């Protein structure tokens, strides 16, 4: 049985790690390199870096820190932000990232997914899906890194997830925007609905506030990993303790000695 992944998420803006609530009111958390090293040493299974200003501002993320991250940590990491072409992705992967993630650019031009998969392989290509419950239904949102530039699309998350899979993406990160940063737990029902409609790995994002939330998302959905930010940045949850509790609850996890 594959182990479930614990994935700290580092939102990057203007060269530092930040965190907001429901994608708004971001506060500075700290240095990218130091936090990456901290989470790697603590036993995280993977890291995700989002340059949250890149897509809304129509620019590629700064890549100067990626090579340094690759030198410092020994776990896989994924990088996202403003990737609009094979050339953009190649620059990031060449610096040492293991995966790249696309979101808004894939919504604008879905063929981008096919092109990235053809060039780099399924295992390198992640698609982020920002899902928001609006007027009684879930819709996929775009350009969510900036409050005044966020766009609600006409797509429902299940249909978009199916298309993403059909185009060859290797993984989906489903971020439930209504739950983001509020620490009330993952949206189990929505995660389950999307996960049951695709066969590729789905990563849960948005809502972690305590260890029980991680236990619940792994027990009551078949997602492959859980992404979180605030609980790790604010030292609410220590990754070694989280891993031990998952193990006690018969959830397969990698324990760091």
Could you describe each region identified by the protein language model?
Residues 11, 39, 47, 92, ...:
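Conserved, mostly hydrophobic/aromatic
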Residues 73, 77-100, 189-226:
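Catalytic cores of alpha/beta
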Residues 2-6, 54-71, 84-90, 104-126, ...:
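Active-site-adjacent beta->alpha loops and helix N-cap segments on the catalytic face
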Residues 17-60:
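N-terminal beta-alpha supersecondary unit
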Residues 1-22, 132-133, 255-257:
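N-terminal amphipathic alpha-helix/helix-capping segment at the start of soluble metabolic enzymes
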Residues 28-40, 85-91, 153-163, 211-214:
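Short, acidic/polar
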Residues 5-9, 46, 74-78, 99-101, ...:
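Structural preference for beta-strand elements that scaffold enzyme active sites
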Residues 12-14, 18-19, 97-174, 178-179, ...:
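Conserved anion-binding
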């Amino acid at each position: 049985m594959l182990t479930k992944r614990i994935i700290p998420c580092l939102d990057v803006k203007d060269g530092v790690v930040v965190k907001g609530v429901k994608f708004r009111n971001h506060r500075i958390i700290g240095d990218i390199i130091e936090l990456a090293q901290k989470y790697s040493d603590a036993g995280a299974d993977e890291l995700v870096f989002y340059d949250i200003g890149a897509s809304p501002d129509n620019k590629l993320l700064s890549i100067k820190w990626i090579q340094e991250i690759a030198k410092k940590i020994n776990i896989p990491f994924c990088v996202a932000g403003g990737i609009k072409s094979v050339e953009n992705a190649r620059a990031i992967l060449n610096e040492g990232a293991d995966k790249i993630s696309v979101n808004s650019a894939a919504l604008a031009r879905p063929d981008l997914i096919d092109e990235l998969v053809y060039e780099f392989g399924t295992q390198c290509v992640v698609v982020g899906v920002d899902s928001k419950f609006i007027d009684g239904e879930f819709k996929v949102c775009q350009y969510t890194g900036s409050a005044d530039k966020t766009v609600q699309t006409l797509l429902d998350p299940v249909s978009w997830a199916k298309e993403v899979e059909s185009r060859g993406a290797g993984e989906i990160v489903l971020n439930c925007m209504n739950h983001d940063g509020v620490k009330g737990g993952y949206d189990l029902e929505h995660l389950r609905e999307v996960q049951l409609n695709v066969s590729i790995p789905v990563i849960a994002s948005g809502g972690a506030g305590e260890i029980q939330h991680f236990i619940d998302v792994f027990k009551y959905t078949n997602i492959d990993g859980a992404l979180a930010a605030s609980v790790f940045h604010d030292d609410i949850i220590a990754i070694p303790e989280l891993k031990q509790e998952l193990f006690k609850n018969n959830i397969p996890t990698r324990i760091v000695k």
